[in-house]
Amino acid sequence: MSKQIVSNVSYPVTPGMTVLLSIDCQFGFGAGSWEQVPHADAAVENFRTASRAWRKCGGAVAHVQTVYTPEREPSGRITDFEPGIAGSLAAGTRAAEAYPDLVLDGDLVVYTTAFSAVQSSDLVDRLRARDIDTVVVGGLTTPICVQTTVDGLSMAGLKVIVLADACASQAIGTLSAEQAHEAAIQRMAYLFAAVEDTGDFVATVRALQPATR
């Protein structure tokens, strides 16, 4: 987990009002792929761990995915910086596929066309329709799609918890992947989200489950 988190904010989780949300956990954001994210596999495995515990107590799981089609093209100014992104994450390609054992029947899946799922989809409306007031987030990549979506969720009035070790980053400019991840986590903790690691979340969730006899 990231060290010395600057925020002391914490939020409770309740299965009926909290959703566990993965952001862009797709092969195109993995190590050695279109977007070089060296710790992607570890982050996704931590999300799987969180989701297994969350599902056991009846919690809902949702997924944001960036998948482009001729009818669903990149929005905003993305193509100014990544001209080939529509092809890199085109429907039907391996890069656009979700990591295995992540999306299960009954999960909510929302497709986006820009970095922020709040700006480029009806994610917030769909969460509110389910009476969700708290969103627990993991995904790829920490400073881009995770951070912009977390910002939007928080500004929309939803409580956000980021699972730091269920997120990962690519290297950005002079920042290593680890440095870029850490900077994004610290920024989100500063004003936008509570931050914890997967182990803490799982312990909290297990405490919600009734004791077995």
Each predicted region: which residue ranges?
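Active-site metal-binding loops of divalent metal-dependent hydrolases
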Residues: 24-25, 67, 140, 166
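Short, electropositive alpha-helical surface patch
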Residues: 72-88
